[in-house]
Amino acid sequence: MAGPESDAQYQFTGIKKYFNSYTLTGRMNCVLATYGSIALIVLYFKLRSKKTPAVKAT
């Protein structure tokens, strides 16, 4: 058999239905969740407030 397996072949329930390594949709959701979490971490560190030092060195 050439090509991806059909989604009807696997009967997943719960979170495994959306995040698995057997179906194309499951793999896509894993990739999107990974990229999304990396983007959120980058945005958090870019946008967090920069604290000014208590004593400025002159």
Curated annotation (Swiss-Prot):
Domain of life: Eukaryota
Membrane topology: Single-pass membrane protein
Record's disease association: Mitochondrial complex V deficiency, nuclear type 6: An autosomal recessive mitochondrial disorder characterized by gross motor developmental delay manifesting in the first years of life, and subsequent episodic developmental regression. The episodes are associated with metabolic stress, including fever, illness, and general anesthesia. Patients develop gait difficulties or loss of ambulation, as well as other variable abnormalities, including abnormal movements, hemiplegia, and persistent lethargy.
Quaternary structure and interacting proteins, as annotated: Component of the ATP synthase complex composed at least of ATP5F1A/subunit alpha, ATP5F1B/subunit beta, ATP5MC1/subunit c (homooctomer), MT-ATP6/subunit a, MT-ATP8/subunit 8, ATP5ME/subunit e, ATP5MF/subunit f, ATP5MG/subunit g, ATP5MK/subunit k, ATP5MJ/subunit j, ATP5F1C/subunit gamma, ATP5F1D/subunit delta, ATP5F1E/subunit epsilon, ATP5PF/subunit F6, ATP5PB/subunit b, ATP5PD/subunit d, ATP5PO/subunit OSCP.
Any GO BP annotation: proton motive force-driven ATP synthesis
Residue spans crossing the bilayer: 23-45
Function: Subunit k, of the mitochondrial membrane ATP synthase complex (F(1)F(0) ATP synthase or Complex V) that produces ATP from ADP in the presence of a proton gradient across the membrane which is generated by electron transport complexes of the respiratory chain. ATP synthase complex consist of a soluble F(1) head domain - the catalytic core - and a membrane F(1) domain - the membrane proton channel. These two domains are linked by a central stalk rotating inside the F(1) region and a stationary peripheral stalk.
The protein, known as: ATP synthase F(0) complex subunit k, mitochondrial
Gene encoding the protein: ATP5MK
Main subcellular location: mitochondrion
InterPro entries named in the record: ATPMK
Record's subcellular location: Mitochondrion membrane
Organism: Homo sapiens (Human)
Keywords associated with the record: Acetylation, Membrane, Mitochondrion, Primary mitochondrial disease, Transmembrane, Transmembrane helix
Pfam families: ATP_synth_reg
Keyword Mitochondrion in record: yes
List of residues that carry N6-acetyllysine: K16, K17
GO cellular component: mitochondrial inner membrane; mitochondrion; proton-transporting ATP synthase complex
Induction: Transactivated by SBP1.
